[in-house]
């Protein structure tokens, strides 16, 4: 950040509207990402407190609440799930109720906090195609080490999630089929058009019949 300070004391960076792998979150470039400045101190210093607004201005820090799973549910047409969330139910509890994991009247976070940890990991990990090994790692990271699963438990969670969420799995298939079709003609740059009209480009697309891979930055 210090290296990016201009003579007028401003700091600038680029904004990528679909920069993060897998989730498509906004991101920055060149090692500076204003969309993900650490909340906690790093080596005794708060990065956020290093930023100050100009004279007569205020700085606002805003966050989109659980935007990825909300958009995923919209894109795949899971409006029953979105209906639960719109009704004021915690998103991870809504997942538990929609998939039959939780049926109690009391809020999940009060009655079954361990189950909420699992639902959070399922929503944020399995919703984006995690396999068993990766899901075990993601679940542990997302819950601060509170959720540790055996390989067998991870495999079961992956299988159950995909069986319980066929609309999400179908969306994955549609996206992959579109890229595969594009790559038949232009494997060096396959393009997917979002609902917003913005393109997402994948470079050097390879399909070995089992796995589809590509790069979001040319030459990587």
Say what each PLM segment does:
Residues 127-178:
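Extended, well-ordered alpha-helical scaffold/bundle regions in very large, multi-domain proteins
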Residues 101-118, 143-159:
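Short, surface-exposed acidic
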Residues 109-112, 124, 137:
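A domain-scale signal for long, ordered structural cores in large, multidomain proteins
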């Amino acid at each position: 950040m210090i290296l990016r300070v201009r003579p007028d004391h401003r700091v600038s960076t680029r904004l990528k509207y679909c920069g993060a792998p897998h989730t498509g979150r906004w991101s920055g470039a060149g090692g500076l990402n204003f969309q993900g400045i650490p909340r906690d101190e790093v080596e005794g210093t708060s990065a956020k407190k290093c930023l100050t607004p100009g004279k007569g201005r205020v700085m606002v820090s805003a966050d989109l609440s659980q935007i990825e799973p909300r958009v995923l549910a919209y894109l795949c047409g899971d409006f029953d799930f979105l209906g639960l969330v719109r009704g004021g139910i915690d998103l991870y509890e809504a997942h538990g109720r929609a998939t039959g994991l939780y049926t109690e009247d009391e809020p999940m976070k009060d009655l079954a906090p361990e189950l909420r940890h699992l639902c959070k990991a399922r929503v944020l990990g399995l919703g984006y195609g995690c396999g068993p090994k990766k899901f075990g790692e993601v679940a542990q990271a997302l819950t601060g080490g509170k959720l540790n699963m055996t390989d067998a438990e991870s495999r079961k969670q992956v299988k159950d999630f995909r069986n319980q969420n066929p609309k999400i799995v179908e969306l994955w298939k549609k996206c992959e089929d579109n890229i595969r079709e594009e790559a038949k003609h232009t494997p060096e740059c396959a393009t997917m058009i979002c609902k917003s009209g913005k393109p997402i480009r994948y470079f050097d697309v390879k399909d070995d019949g089992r796995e589809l891979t590509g790069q979001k930055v040319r030459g990587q």
